């Protein structure tokens, strides 16, 4: 067992051979590597599976032995400075390792089929494997320098994957936006790390905790400077986990392939910020102002993410704002000191959100056969509807993920979210009211997504929903280059509703985009499973292939049962705290709260749970009332669906609803504010500086030059070499 811990430093580097071999193969043997490209799914999954097995073994040892292991190598540069690097295995590391590997394996398995048609298949798997390597290195780091190195690698991989289809202008803009926004947080993180080193002289977590505790206890540290360092450290987590006000990159990150969205939102990039705050919580907890600030940012993000998700029409953007809101719950829990609740929600949310994103990928995959490779069509919920008849397995999986995120028992997110809500009442009643209200909003917007996607009629030819007569279609196989074919516009909705099934089928089949030699229907996936029966048709959306469905089914099982790890099994006060998660987190909980009592009053738990579940069902009821097909008007798919027109003068309630809808659909006008105040402000400042440089600075120097030139030209004629002219000038002056 000792050898397992000692050599666990190799864990982050196990997936690394895949991107290295792909790169070498493309350089030395490009033709053979491209011809055998489908084989790279197997080594990617196999190597990550080895990491998963090691992670499970380490977690079992953590549960049984309850200790923290750290192995450090010292690199002495001179007598005054030595850099120590190594790896740290503790409960937080074990949880993150299992989370990254399990979600990563399922996403890779899913991606083999999802990306089979894409010319960038090899590039995709190289990026994905390096992404996993970077995240594994981040969670096993034993000091702040290592964390910063892998932190930057995670950001680089996310930049590459968000802009995977880089010839698509929106994708290129999105990856730049994510990169620049995260640079703000990363710069703050770097300054915070350097500030802590200036105070303590160490980057190691164990030294930081001990030295800072002693310095603060003896009042030997400048309090304001230390608080500033903590704020800067937290800024890195704010940007990476898409917390307000650095959240603007997250919805635009949906321009990348859907499997990337699943991995980023479940177990890698956005989880990195939560991991950093959890890792540094022993530092933050010393200063109450920092904890209050963390909880404040968390509760603002909870509410903002939920309100911005209310009116999104893009299915992936709606899920992105959902992720933002749920990350706010985790940050709120950390700010309240609820370490266990935050990590519990990180676990349950990861599997539920991965399921939802892979489900949305299956929906998009099926819609592309009808509307072509156009994100503004294949991801638009207004063009969906009635898909439960065509993609029943995807519908069931998506419903399970939706119910879990809504907090419906006994699904995974119910247990963790309810624990956060209970702790919030003890921390601040105002925060608790906001958190509980947001739980109702979560149920509303999640069921809105479900109802618009799976219930009602298939609205693929319902055009002009946003006032646009046409939109561009893109070919993923060409990395975003526009294709010449377009879907017929100005199609009447009434004819769609009145035509019979045969007419509908023939109409859709005539407008189907056929896929070329690289198409999905002509390439068999490297991994084939025959457990499910799917019906392929191009008249209506069809169920995804079995490889994609397999990953979704496994995530359904996780969503159903992963909540068990945090549920107390015994009902007496002596053993009530001996659930699996508490056993695993026992060393960390004792470090943060030496006299903590994890006992649970089941009567109080049931009472609070009944309240939160009632709020969730109320949100579901409102969503059903507004978006259920029997009440909905297909001509106005927004918050005004169920309200009849009352003449030209709308009442105040209509204006309020319109205002809420506009606020949500336009992202709270935060992006517009940043564009005006920052982007245009910086450009205006640059133009002003350019004007001053060209006109003022250059004008002064050029003016001196011109003055000297004309002065020289003037006196040149005076000194022409004639003595008579010199005498005349002399006598005229004197």
UniProtKB/Swiss-Prot annotation:
Where does it reside? Plastid, Chloroplast thylakoid membrane
Q: What's the stated role of this polypeptide?
A: NDH shuttles electrons from NAD(P)H:plastoquinone, via FMN and iron-sulfur (Fe-S) centers, to quinones in the photosynthetic chain and possibly in a chloroplast respiratory chain. The immediate electron acceptor for the enzyme in this species is believed to be plastoquinone. Couples the redox reaction to proton translocation, and thus conserves the redox energy in a proton gradient.
Q: What is its EC number?
A: 7.1.1.-
Per its UniProt entry, which superkingdom is the organism in? Eukaryota
MF term (GO), any: NADH dehydrogenase (ubiquinone) activity
**What parts of the sequence cross the membrane?**
9-29, 40-60, 89-109, 125-145, 147-167, 185-205, 219-239, 258-278, 280-300, 327-347, 354-374, 396-416, 425-445, 549-569, 605-625
Which top EC class is given? translocase
Please describe the quaternary structure of this protein. Answer: NDH is composed of at least 16 different subunits, 5 of which are encoded in the nucleus.
Query: In its UniProt entry, what is this protein called?
Result: NAD(P)H-quinone oxidoreductase subunit 5, chloroplastic
Entry similarity comment: Belongs to the complex I subunit 5 family.
Q: Which GO terms describe its biological process?
A: ATP synthesis coupled electron transport; electron transport coupled proton transport
Presence of the UniProt keyword NAD in the record: yes
A single GO CC term, please? chloroplast thylakoid membrane
Q: What is its main location?
A: plastid
Q: Which UniProt keywords apply?
A: Chloroplast, Membrane, NAD, NADP, Plastid, Plastoquinone, Quinone, Thylakoid, Translocase, Transmembrane, Transmembrane helix, Transport
Catalytic activity of the protein: a plastoquinone + NADH + (n+1) H(+)(in) = a plastoquinol + NAD(+) + n H(+)(out); a plastoquinone + NADPH + (n+1) H(+)(in) = a plastoquinol + NADP(+) + n H(+)(out)
**Its membrane topology:** Multi-pass membrane protein
What NCBIfam families does the record point to? NDH_I_L (TIGR01974), PRK06590.1 (NF005141)
